[in-house]
Amino acid sequence: MTVSRIATAGLALLLAAACTVPTPPRGQAGTAAGMVCAPPPGPPGPETATTIDVIEQAYFCILGNYYSAATLDARQLLAAGFIALTQELNRNGRDVPEATMPALTGDRKADWAAFEAVYRKTTDQVPGLRDKLAVVTLEAMVAALDDNHASWAHDIKRNPGYYDGDGEGLGLQTNVTGSQATGNPGVAVPPLFVTTVQGGAVKAAGLRPGDVIESVNGSAPFIDGKPTSAIAALYPQYPEARPVKLRLLRQSTGRRWSVTLKPGLYQRDLAALQVVQSKLMDDTAYVRVRGFAPDSATRALRAISRLRTGRTLNGVVLDLRGNGGGSPTEAARLLSAFVHGKDTHYLCTADSRCESVRTDDTVELLGLPLVVLTDRGCASACEHFGSAVKDLRIGRLVGTRTAGLMAGPTQPYLLSNNTMLGFPSRHGLGANREEINRIGVAPDHHVPSTPQDAAAGRDPALAKALTLLHK
């Protein structure tokens, strides 16, 4: 999964959850009838072929709505698209004399006209490749934004045997998440080890939390402390079906062995599908929020209220590890149970015109101490929450630095072939107007997990949080 595919997954989650984000400024509208893009009114219809007209619509959609469109050099998008086109020709053993990049002047409309003319001349000579060339061209143009919240969702296939709640893949999680391995590898640190056995081939092979993965398909996951592309093979997505060979070490016994795992569907633990889980830990309310889906803040607050009934709590531990984000509105609502009258986040244009996301002061204050657990899987709206907790001194963060994937809330746009383009209309900053994207939010107490912790079922970050609340 590339950065684009990670963003695509986020876009799909956004659409499935009907998450609303601020309406973007129109800026420059599309240049022709039918070229204006708009948020989808509902689920898209059947997907049709990607054509040069769809690429044109996406090009002007970006220039009219992307948060930095006013300062964006559109020639970079066209150049990236043309590079991808010529590379795809080469991969298919073809080339076309007319496939030469036209001179671009910086006039967005004129440059598009020049690009389109050459594109049509090129693709007309290879009609059998027309669909492939269109797809790679648009993919490259979106990727040229270099934005972890920009994506183009298309050709999404689902395993025909899939049922709601099924897991798919090898059936494991490691200390390097799928998003880190494929789109944010710089944040990964060795060793690579199993943290959760979810089911599927991994469970059948007898792997356990704490097992160290020494190689993936014969390649080391880290070289000189830096992650390699081999880790991505742990997270195949349908229709990827090639077996994955792992070399493993169980440190408690010294055993080394190899297994070959085949991706597939598997039944997941129903508890793992719950967005909000809670339990009482002595006199502390522990609440895990896996994502900021609609109504997640209300569910979390109801859980705390239930745990508080008939007893005095000494505080709240909010576990946001692995929370991939969701609605910034939900994040702000949950924050509002701990502080009122504050700016929690800023959404800005490229010229630094910003609007704040305020606390919802209709939410009743809990009046309880707060500790938040974070890790590199805490992304987007989760980082909005974590940065506000730290900046506004609402509580303390324990664990590891967050993902650094907070470009801004994704706004979806429906293209004419029923595919979905998504990108931020405004850029996100923390409560102190600091940059979080690509950097993440540092914890107040750095408590990483180890293979030994995973093997023994220990949670050192949670233990630290409970200790802090009991001081």
Regions found by a protein language model. Give the residues of each.
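Bacterial N-terminal signal peptides that target proteins for export
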Residues: M1-G10
